Structures are given as C-alpha cells and as structure tokens.
Amino acid sequence: MYIIPQDNVVIKYITFETKGADPLKLMERAKDILLGENRKYTIDYRQGDSIWFVIDTDTWEKEGKIVPLRGFCSSQNEEIPKQYDEVKMYSAWNVAQSNPCFEIWLYYHFYENKPEDADVEKYASFKEFVASTISGGFDFQRDPARLEDAIENTRNNISQDADGKPTLYSSEVYVLGEEIDKFVKSDLAKLRNKLG
C-alpha cells in the first residue's frame, strides 16, 4: 500500500511477522496490541481513529477464517457508543478484502474492467498476471497519482456473493482508498501535475 504523509494524519502500519498472515492471528494480534492490558497503541474513537485489516481471500475464505474477523470488527464497532456516550457508532474497525488478492487493487489503478479469465490463466498466479500486465510493475512513487482512478474502477467492478463477500476480481480496498483520498487529494493533484 502507499501512503502520502499528512500533518493531520498519523498512520501506523502494523506488520505481521509471517508471510500470508492468517486472519484469525491478525485478529488476536490486534486484540493484544490495541485492546489488551499491555496494549502498544491507543485508539482514540473521539478523533475518528480507524483500524483496517487488508486481506486476501486466498484459502482463508475456504477455511472459514474471514467471517470471524468480520464479526470481531462488527462487535468492536457496536461497542464504541457503549463505551463513549459522546461518540456515535461508526466503522472504526474494518475489513478490506480482495479476491483473489491485493494485486487486483493495483490492477484497477490502470484498468477499468475486470480481467479476462483466459488472460489470467496464462500465468501461474494472479500476482504474476498483474506484474506482467502493468508495464514496469507498480511504481509506489509514481502510481499513487492514480488513486482516484483505482477507487472508481474498483467500485465499478465490485460484486458480492449472497453472503456479501467479494467475488473474483473484486476488492473492498477502494473504501480504504476513499478514506485516504480525503486527506491526500491535493497532494495527489500536485503529483499528477508534476508527472504530466
């Protein structure tokens, strides 16, 4: 993910020690570092703090590990007004799921339509497909200028199954993108002008 620093925004990117982080382990880690007695970070709901779990569908969906994470986020959101009378319920805890993986979000920075299955099937993985489709690969210095395109393209291509889960080639990361865009809009305009 890319972030453009802002004076009025503090972003804490919390990594996980292992590759392919299990959503249930992410949830437990969040409980520990954000909610536990020995928490490392403090959430200020009065300031509109939010927490985002950006996850791939991978095998986690089949293993039933995403639904509990979503349930945990919902229950945390429901608790906010109970803990703080002056704070109305809002989506402080969020899941941004991509199907099949985060790279679909990168793909939509450049393309308006979902990829064709026949094109994707030529590659060993969707990540390889995206790497070959974006000439030179995704440039994290230059390509954030395409954030608004990515938001629009992803929003226009999102579809969900009967349970509200993103279907193939869909991503909820655009919702996080909309939140980021509120703070970086003018900087992205400057970057677009600089790049021509």
Per-segment meaning from a language model:
Residues Y2-E17, L24, A30-W52, T57-G196:
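C-terminal accessory helical subdomains adjacent to catalytic cores in phosphodiester-
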